[in-house]
From Swiss-Prot:
Record's keyword terms, sorted: DNA damage, DNA repair, DNA replication, Ligase, Magnesium, Manganese, Metal-binding, NAD, Zinc
Source organism: Mycobacterium leprae (strain TN)
Role this protein plays: DNA ligase that catalyzes the formation of phosphodiester linkages between 5'-phosphoryl and 3'-hydroxyl groups in double-stranded DNA using NAD as a coenzyme and as the energy source for the reaction. It is essential for DNA replication and repair of damaged DNA.
Protein's UniProt name: DNA ligase
GO terms assigned for molecular function: DNA ligase (NAD+) activity; metal ion binding
Amino acid sequence: MSSPEADPIGPEVLQQWRKLTEEVREHQFRYYVRDAPIISDAEFDALLDRLTVLEEQHPELCTPDSPTQLVGGAGFMTDFVATEHLERMFSLDNAFSGDELNAWVTRIRAEIGNDAHYLCELKIDGVALSLVYRDGRLTRATTRGDGRTGEDVTLNARTIEDVPERLTVSDIYPLPEVLEVRGEVFFRVVDFQALNTSLVEEGKNPFANPRNSAAGSLRQKDPAVTAHRKLRMICHGLGHIEGFRPATQHQAYLALRDWGLPVSEHTTLVNDIAGVQGCIAYWAEHRHEVDHEIDGIVVKIDEVTLQRRLGSTSRAPRWAIAYKYLPEEAQTKLLDIRVNVGRTGRVTPFAFMTPVKVAGSTVGQATLHNPSEVKRKGVLIGDTVVIRKAGDVIPEVLGPVVDLRDGSEREFVMPTTCPECGTTLAPEKEGDADIRCPNARSCPGQLRERVFHVASRSALDIQGLGYEAGVALLAAQVITSEGDLFTLTEKALLRTELFRNKAGELSANGKRLLVNVDKAKTAPLWRVLVALSIRHVGPTAARALATEFGSVDAILAASPEQLAAVEGVGTTIAAAVTEWFTVDWHRVIVNKWRAAGVRMVDERDTSVLPTCEGLTIVVTGSLAGFSRDDAKEAIVARGGKVAGSVSKKIAYVVVGDLPGYKYDKAVELGVPILNEDGFRLLLEQGPPVQQVVD
């Protein structure tokens, strides 16, 4: 069959060809790269046929890179071509102390006075990216590079869920003709961990930290690889812009959000340096409540006119600074891997390392969780490893520095018998990652850990019964199990040197311990349930069980189906609770505690009225009279629920200092907002409470 005779190419034909080519390439990209087609195969075939016919009629349009000449996803490869930014992409100057921050404030006040407002943002530990939109359509994505020229990674950026292909038209902020927006590409911690797991399963080296993995994933030659890695992005600044001029940085973020671009929920506008310092202090304590890595707070002058007056140096804007927290990662030598037996019998490998200073404290040990995790992380004894200590979180080994290996490293071999009691180790069931010691009742290691857990803050919170005290009581056989804790006497404590003073009498610590043990007998039922060391039962599930059933006896009598039906419990926890109560010696512990006077029923304070019953409440910012846990406890105790995000279903948003974008979201959705006084009023009298904000 001969080809149709070639016709002259007119402007309409050329426009039609360009439109068809663009459509076909777009759908090929969605199908082969993003794995997320939006039209059927038949519809795509029809588009491709139309393009093929058009090129047969006009052979000069049929170029080697036409979709009709390429197979499948061919042609979608990132070449990292050097590309100039429309406007220079600066770095930030850093402050590592309060003095350095104050010095920056002093410098800028000398030029712009004291009337400026400050915008505080989380400094995301990721990789910088610049997006360019023309008439609302994404046309280019470029890495920072040297600030003037970066690498074109447009195809890869298009696979990021948060990066819109087209901007949303806003009723408030006009779409710019040209918009160059800057942001940070990163991994959520949970997605980083999942990526490393898959890499190890494929026999590849895992990434040492989320930042490295974000950079590596963004710079893949094959965009399909990037598409299958769950990169995220948050925008934090503007470059070149035509057709819109925000008056403030805060207004710019509101506009970006309206246009469908991702902005942080945790940006806070403050009036003075005291507000800045408060923000820095707050996030130093709460930084690990965010689902991605942060390494500081970025402080910016909010007013754009003042930003222009301050200008920039050769590398950084003078109107912004990054306050950096103490580094949470460090490199050190992995000297050995040894195992520890936990309270539920799980045998956990621990890394023993050359002590190193990280996040303000010295770290020499870190958990490796289980043998599968050791393999997933790819660490060998003798490796130089990257460790992380996140605030109060237990130190963690992130991975090895493979380039520093010298061949002397060796693999860790999991022991086959318990190091505490000699019992053969095994997974509880086939396929489990955790290896356990089945000698639950009498294994010294498990017994020690259970006693320590009973006294922990999340359980009965018995001051004075720390690890050393628990070991001493067991060693002197003052107690033989956690069941004996509530029958402690002065005479029994005198058998341990730890609780005797020089005169041979009971020490002050011993007296305090007896008082605190007695006090723990009246703890709420949920704390008793946590203290029993039932697998999977933490404070949340324990509260739900205590509220629903009201007593240990009722929980014991409930069927697995009844337990699982409780919100916050589910089938896994229900099965664990049912199984725990079938063990004879477990019931012996319950009966010993009951006989000693431990409260086994949920005796609720009748003075606490159910003022929040049926309400779902969000708490954001820092409250003066409540810790975050106290506020949650107060709401739950009154029958309410606590949510982590704002939606139209939320009854109230309680706002403290530095509330961030949850406050803005509440305003946008019309959700009632309460300050701390309003919150107290709600707790006391229940709804309706008139919106109360400062």
